[in-house]
Amino acid sequence: AAKDIKFGVEARGLMLQGVEQLADAVKVTMGPKGRNVVIE
């Protein structure tokens, strides 16, 4: 939910999951055969 506030190790783990998801979505746009990605 948008209003959940997390602290400490739990917050770090959840943030890492989000960053990894974003990186997976964006990495296909890199390189000579880069494709378009829509992030909702």
Swiss-Prot record:
Implicated in mitochondrial protein import and macromolecular assembly. May facilitate the correct folding of imported proteins. May also prevent misfolding and promote the refolding and proper assembly of unfolded polypeptides generated under stress conditions in the mitochondrial matrix. GO terms for molecular function: ATP binding; ATP-dependent protein folding chaperone. It is found in: Mitochondrion. GO terms for cellular component: mitochondrion. PANTHER family: 60 KDA HEAT SHOCK PROTEIN, MITOCHONDRIAL. Induction: By heat shock. InterPro entries: Cpn60/GroEL, GROEL-like_equatorial_sf. Belongs to the chaperonin (HSP60) family. This is Chaperonin HSP60, mitochondrial. The keyword Mitochondrion applies. Keywords: ATP-binding, Chaperone, Mitochondrion, Nucleotide-binding, Stress response. The keyword Oxidoreductase does not apply. It comes from Solanum tuberosum. It comes from the Eukaryota. Its main location: mitochondrion. One of its GO terms (biological process) is protein refolding.
